[in-house]
A protein has these predicted regions:
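A ligand-binding cleft/hinge motif common to bilobed small-molecule-binding domains
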Residues: 58-70, 152-178
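Acidic, polar ligand-binding/catalytic clefts
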Residues: 47-105
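Short helix-initiation/N-cap motifs at beta->coil->alpha
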Residues: 36-47, 136-151, 188-189
Length: 253
């Protein structure tokens, strides 16, 4: 039986090779047949999951919370020292004219670009609290990629853009030189999570052991470094998952 492993579409394109390397290594170490799925958008991810085609998924924390609660997935591992943070950025310099200098400069009716990543939006709204802005106060501009969000900010088509911090920091030097980060979150306890469906059954333990065992090994560590997860992965318990879900609920309140 082949298991489909889906990687959330939250990461920079440069990471794709690393995910394929990881998939190959997990197959070798677990003895399981794994087929990698790399959807281009959140909508494509949702469709694949709804069609029952996803056996394991490296999901962002917001999606992970709903999949654990509503779809019977279980959390088995998470990256160590690799929390999901987000950045609010706007155009740098005077080229953008009235570009915001601080979060407080953003006013009701402002335009903000972002990809369809619910936890980035959720955390971003919390960071906007000093500006006294709610979700309804903002004109949201949905884009497919972080690069598109960056372009809109640089061109002054939006007042700011939301980014997954890893995606922001992986933008080219030229792009980042034209952006100014207004704020970056420091939550620490919210991470992407590897989930498995009930269909995987006892094989979930084999996947977890293969993943957790990569750290510091001659073949595993270079792959982790390629993915920007140098600390590797650690097992995640049901209690750990419930704690993170409670934290997400707090952000929603």
């Amino acid at each position: 039986m082949t298991l489909n492993l889906l990687i959330a579409p939250d990461f920079a394109p440069e990471r794709f090779a690393g995910w394929h390397m990881l998939n190959t290594l997990l197959q070798k170490r677990s003895g399981l047949q794994l087929h990698l799925l790399t959807p281009a958008s959140a909508a494509e991810q949702a469709q694949l999951i709804a069609e029952g085609k996803v056996d394991a998924v490296y999901a962002n924390p917001f999606d992970a919370a709903s999949m654990i609660r509503d779809a019977g997935y279980q959390a088995i591992a998470r990256p160590m020292g690799k929390s999901d943070e987000m950045v609010i950025a706007t155009a740098a310099g005077s080229a953008a004219g009235s570009a915001a200098s601080t979060v407080e400069d953003l006013q009701p009716g402002c335009k903000i670009a972002l990809t369809d990543n619910k936890d980035v939006k959720l955390i971003g709204l919390r960071l906007l609290e000093p500006a006294d802005l709610t979700e309804a106060d903002i004109q949201w501009q949905m884009v497919d990629t972080h690069q598109a969000a960056a372009r809109m900010a640089i061109k002054g088509e939006v007042d700011a853009s939301f980014f997954l911090a890893e995606a922001y920091h992986s933008l080219s030097k030229l792009t980042k030189s034209q952006l100014k980060a207004l704020m970056e979150s420091k939550l620490a306890d919210i991470t992407h999570v590897l989930l498995t469906s009930a269909k995987v059954g006892a094989d979930a333990e084999r996947v977890k052991e293969a993943l957790v065992g990569l750290t510091g090994t001659p073949d595993g560590q270079p792959v982790l470094d390629e993915l920007g997860i140098a600390g590797g992965f650690e097992p995640m318990t049901q209690e750990d998952a419930e704690f993170m879900i409670d934290l997400m609920d707090t952000l929603l309140d």
